[in-house]
UniProtKB/Swiss-Prot annotation:
Protein name per the record: Unknown protein from spot 32 of 2D-PAGE of etiolated coleoptile
Source organism superkingdom: Eukaryota
Other comment: On the 2D-gel the determined pI of this unknown protein is: 5.5, its MW is: 42.7 kDa.
Length: 15
């Protein structure tokens, strides 16, 4: 449950 949110939040947090 750490690899899923990371990829989904990484692009959203960077933007």
């Amino acid at each position: 449950a750490l690899s899923v949110p990371v990829f989904a939040v990484a692009p959203l947090n960077k933007k």
